[in-house]
Amino acid sequence: MEPDSVIEDKTIELMCSVPRSLWLGCANLVESMCALSCLQSMPSVRCLQISNGTSSVIVSRKRPSEGNYQKEKDLCIKYFDQWSESDQVEFVEHLISRMCHYQHGHINSYLKPMLQRDFITALPEQGLDHIAENILSYLDARSLCAAELVCKEWQRVISEGMLWKKLIERMVRTDPLWKGLSERRGWDQYLFKNRPTDGPPNSFYRSLYPKIIQDIETIESNWRCGRHNLQRIQCRSENSKGVYCLQYDDEKIISGLRDNSIKIWDKTSLECLKVLTGHTGSVLCLQYDERVIVTGSSDSTVRVWDVNTGEVLNTLIHHNEAVLHLRFSNGLMVTCSKDRSIAVWDMASATDITLRRVLVGHRAAVNVVDFDDKYIVSASGDRTIKVWSTSTCEFVRTLNGHKRGIACLQYRDRLVVSGSSDNTIRLWDIECGACLRVLEGHEELVRCIRFDNKRIVSGAYDGKIKVWDLQAALDPRAPASTLCLRTLVEHSGRVFRLQFDEFQIISSSHDDTILIWDFLNVPPSAQNETRSPSRTYTYISR
């Protein structure tokens, strides 16, 4: 005698003949069908017990004849197709929840290829090429190379979308090295323009990219190995020799001299374009923008000049002794003096400059200042660095650590880098006042210092310029012996001031020269000079 509630072959037929609204809520019928389906997939299983919490069903596997099975399956599919999508999903969930692990694996294998769709190929078929291009435009160079090899359609999308051009443009927008290189090498003319019919094809940019990478790697190697092309400007001062300060751009170099003059040089020809006179003492510091040059002198005055005509626009008389350093930006100027004070000025225009506040607290000459929207930072011969609020001009904290007076510093973001007459360079966290690293190597006073995201470049009274690895210096695990990348020796006197970018260092000295250390345009013959990094090519201005 068969067990109670045995489901015969008529189960599926019964399910199909009963309206769906009646059987969907009937657990026994649904569970019976699930059990039957499971048994049909597992020949070794002869019976299966299913419980819904209130009753149990014993299912015997007994597959119908082939003809009946096909008929019943077609009928099930017919009813399934009549349901809404949500009802279909609900029903399939019921089935899957009652299946065994073996069946789940089989279903997963069946669904896997259905879920793997080539949407990049599918989008253009729907007229959505621009979306496919936009998706692939986020790839880096390595991934873009791989994407080109996927299939011809992907290669077509990359080519017609000019994605190599877009990748280069993205790098130029975000990386100063790429931007500067594009201008110096001339390939910026092919960027940021709508593609003309006769413009370079995608293959041009595809081949340009590795050339750019090779150029960048060569520049980095030149920095590390000290390979450079050296240009020299002889300033030919009338009386006292020495170039105390300088600043440059792509077109000109402006220098302040010990002989009280300001000289403007053409950066390409190295010829002197203009000489500005008016100070009665050495020009110790300067800064310029597209409108004005501001200079500080040992005559205790600050002068403002028209950058184009050289006309004196304003003279500020406030400090009692030499003006040693100054900075201006966004309508604010800060000057410091041998008189131990710091002056904060509101700079509405070249002719409208008013004193806002005088900061006192240093016990010796204030040699250098720097600032941003948050802090004013000053360094003094009293061995301290002081931090002040830019908005309120109130004192914030003192950074202590140098053993002797501080001659130079630069401040950016949270980092302060300072150089001292104790012959060391220190890196500081301005927010907590902690000294992060001490760099040793110079043999005399460190007179000037600048840094960017990669390097620190310092100049000292020993006549040497040193290039340091900034990222390694910020890593406490890095050995001290690995921090100095290169020492450059060409000046025959004290190095007073320097500025640098990704491609060059420009420095000035007590030896009355300005040197341009070019790490980009190094002659091919020097590229193989690994043992003579100081090899130079000198051009003397006339």
From Swiss-Prot:
Induction: Expression is negatively regulated by Wnt/beta-catenin pathway. It holds the Pfam family F-box-like. One of its GO terms (molecular function) is microtubule plus-end binding. GO terms for biological process: brain morphogenesis; establishment of mitotic spindle orientation; germ cell development; microtubule organizing center organization; nuclear migration; positive regulation of canonical NF-kappaB signal transduction; positive regulation of circadian rhythm; positive regulation of DNA-templated transcription. Pathway: Protein modification; protein ubiquitination. Residues 67-116 are annotated as: Homodimerization domain D. It comes from the Eukaryota. The keyword Lyase does not apply. Keywords: Biological rhythms, Cell cycle, Cytoplasm, Disease variant, Host-virus interaction, Nucleus, Repeat, Ubl conjugation pathway, WD repeat, Wnt signaling pathway. It is found in: Cytoplasm; Nucleus. GO terms for cellular component: axon cytoplasm; centrosome; cytoplasmic microtubule; cytosol; kinetochore; microtubule associated complex; neuron projection; neuronal cell body. The keyword Nucleus applies. WD repeats lie at residues 238-275, 278-315, 318-355, 361-398, 401-440, 442-478, 490-527. It is linked to Neurodevelopmental, jaw, eye, and digital syndrome: An autosomal dominant syndrome characterized by variable features including mild-to-severe developmental delay, speech delay, autistic and/or stereotypical behaviors, ocular anomalies, under- or overdeveloped jaw, and digital anomalies such as brachydactyly, clinodactyly, syndactyly, and contractures. Self-associates. Component of the SCF(FBXW11) complex formed of CUL1, SKP1, RBX1 and a FBXW11 dimer. Interacts with BST2 and USP47. Interacts with TRIM21. Interacts with PER3. Interacts with INAVA. Interacts with REST. (Microbial infection) Interact with Rift valley fever virus NSs (via omegaXaV motif); this interaction is important for EIF2AK2/PKR degradation. The N-terminal D domain mediates homodimerization. Substrate recognition component of a SCF (SKP1-CUL1-F-box protein) E3 ubiquitin-protein ligase complex which mediates the ubiquitination and subsequent proteasomal degradation of target proteins. Probably recognizes and binds to phosphorylated target proteins: the interaction with substrates requires the phosphorylation of the two serine residues in the substrates' destruction motif D-S-G-X(2,3,4)-S. SCF(FBXW11) mediates the ubiquitination of phosphorylated CTNNB1 and participates in Wnt signaling regulation. This is F-box/WD repeat-containing protein 11. It comes from Homo sapiens (Human). The gene is FBXW11.
